[in-house]
Swiss-Prot record:
This is Putative protein-disulfide oxidoreductase DsbI. Interacts with DsbL. The keyword Transport applies. PANTHER family: DISULFIDE BOND FORMATION PROTEIN B, PROTEIN-DISULFIDE OXIDOREDUCTASE DSBI. GO terms for molecular function: protein-disulfide reductase activity. Keywords: Cell inner membrane, Cell membrane, Disulfide bond, Electron transport, Membrane, Oxidoreductase, Redox-active center, Transmembrane, Transmembrane helix, Transport. One of its GO terms (biological process) is protein folding.
Length: 266
């Protein structure tokens, strides 16, 4: 009987109907906030991996997507709500993909034999969309304290005698910290240096995009929603507006040269 019920559920499943429910948006919120909290509490606070400029941007991108999901929870079937929820979700994904690709490029350059191959540098003070001073509002979350492309643990001396076995397993033992799982930086498979943090985050954003884009297309093609195409155009337009108006450039921001970063660690 359970198999029959499962087949009936699969047969009656509609992506268009599903995107009108709170479930996909709740999953989006859990994933994005969960990853952001892991980055902050586990990697930054517990394992002493300081975030760089692109890292804090990726946190912002994740939270933008989460805000879109929270808005959708109000009434996911409402077209006006959809405009804001889809727009913020796609906007966050767009930013996230850009920042992940930038971070991966920096990571490859820093760890290559030619460390001066076309990377502009790393800002000490980040520039967020619409000049949001997030680094002032929540500095522990959004102010970069690490070097670009260098995600090795930086353990303060006053913590040497307070490390537990779990921390030592990942970051190593003092004073050199060379025998930890992440002593050479974070990788999905550290022994092979396979898939750095930027690539893993890139995959996460791509997975979110695939699911959301499928939901979006199902919404647009739903015959029971005659105005869906109009609202879809509004969503696309709003994403473009957010992306291009939100970009800001402040020449007075302090920029640390990548050359100095590389020389410091060479």
């Amino acid at each position: 009987m359970s198999c029959i019920k499962m087949k009936d559920k699969c047969r009656n499943f509609s992506l268009s109907k599903w995107q009108d429910t709170r479930k996909p948006w709740l999953i989006l919120i859990i994933v994005t906030i969960g990853l952001t909290c892991i980055a902050h509490f586990l990697f930054q606070e517990y394992l002493f991996m300081k975030p760089c400029e692109q890292c804090v941007y990726i946190r912002f991108d994740m939270l933008v997507m989460a805000i879109g999901g929270m808005i959708a929870l109000i009434n996911p079937a409402n077209n006006i709500i959809k405009i804001f929820s889809y727009s913020l979700a796609f906007y966050g994904i767009w930013l996230g993909l850009e920042h992940c690709l930038t971070l991966n490029h920096i990571h490859e350059v820093v760890h290559s034999e030619n460390p001066f191959a076309g990377v502009d540098g790393c800002r000490e003070i980040p520039i967020y969309p619409f000049n949001l001073p997030l680094y002032k509002w929540a500095s522990s979350w959004f102010l970069p304290t690490g070097e670009c492309g260098m995600d090795t643990p930086v353990v303060p001396e006053n913590a040497y005698n307070h490390l537990n076995a779990f921390q030592k397993f990942f970051i190593g033992t003092p004073p050199d910290f060379e025998n930890g799982l992440y002593s050479n930086g974070w990788y999905l498979i550290p022994s092979l240096k396979f898939m750095n943090m930027a690539i893993c985050c890139l995959i996460a954003f791509l997975c979110c995009f695939v699911v959301l884009f499928a939901m979006f297309i199902a919404y647009v093609l739903d015959k029971n929603k005659p105005n869906a195409k109009i609202f879809a155009l509004v969503i696309v337009a709003l994403v473009l507006v957010l992306k291009f108006i939100g970009e800001s450039k402040n020449p007075n921001q302090n920029i640390a040269s990548l050359n100095q970063v590389v020389l410091r660690y060479s």
